[in-house]
């Protein structure tokens, strides 16, 4: 516990807020190249095969990122755009791939929540 004098001399240090997506380096999105595309199983109460890609970003950092939506066209050397946002049941996956940009194609036959999956408006 500091004395009043110590507080007047030095003051209190403010706590630094920790980022949930440090690899983005405070950018909204980052471009990267897929180094590996694979499926993983989620944590305990859930069961599925979640689609994940390992991506090397333009700043040299390599991260795991989730591929949302039904079906995808990504493979090794695909150029993708990445945004923050973790997947709760996949440990270590803190980023999402943005569908419908660069090499990532939007979800086919998507009627609702189209903007989240890069789907065009159906005719």
UniProtKB/Swiss-Prot annotation:
UniProt entry keywords in alphabetical sequence: Methylation, Ribonucleoprotein, Ribosomal protein, RNA-binding, rRNA-binding, tRNA-binding
GO process terms (BP): translation
Alphabetized InterPro entries for the sequence: NA-bd_OB-fold (IPR012340), Ribosomal_uS12 (IPR006032), Ribosomal_uS12_bac (IPR005679)
Sections of the chain in a coiled coil: none
Location of 3-methylthioaspartic acid modifications: 89
GO molecular function: rRNA binding; structural constituent of ribosome; tRNA binding
Annotated Gene Ontology cellular component terms: small ribosomal subunit
Entries under Pfam families matching the protein: Ribosom_S12_S23
Family of this protein: Belongs to the universal ribosomal protein uS12 family.
Function description: With S4 and S5 plays an important role in translational accuracy.
Subunit architecture: Part of the 30S ribosomal subunit. Contacts proteins S8 and S17. May interact with IF1 in the 30S initiation complex.
Protein name as it appears in the record: Small ribosomal subunit protein uS12
Annotated source species: Geobacter metallireducens (strain ATCC 53774 / DSM 7210 / GS-15)
Name of encoding gene: rpsL
């Amino acid at each position: 516990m500091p004395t009043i004098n110590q507080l007047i001399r030095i003051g209190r240090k403010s706590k630094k807020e920790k980022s949930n997506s440090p690899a983005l380096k405070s950018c909204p999105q980052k471009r990267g190249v897929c180094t590996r595309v694979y499926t993983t199983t989620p944590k305990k109460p859930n069961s599925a095969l979640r689609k994940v890609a390992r991506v090397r970003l333009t700043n040299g950092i390599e991260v795991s990122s989730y591929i949302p939506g039904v079906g995808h066209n990504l493979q090794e050397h695909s150029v993708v755009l990445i945004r923050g946002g973790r997947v709760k049941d996949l440990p270590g996956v803190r980023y999402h791939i943005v569908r419908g940009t660069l090499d990532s194609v939007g979800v086919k036959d998507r009627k609702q929540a189209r903007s989240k999956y890069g789907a065009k408006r159906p005719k």
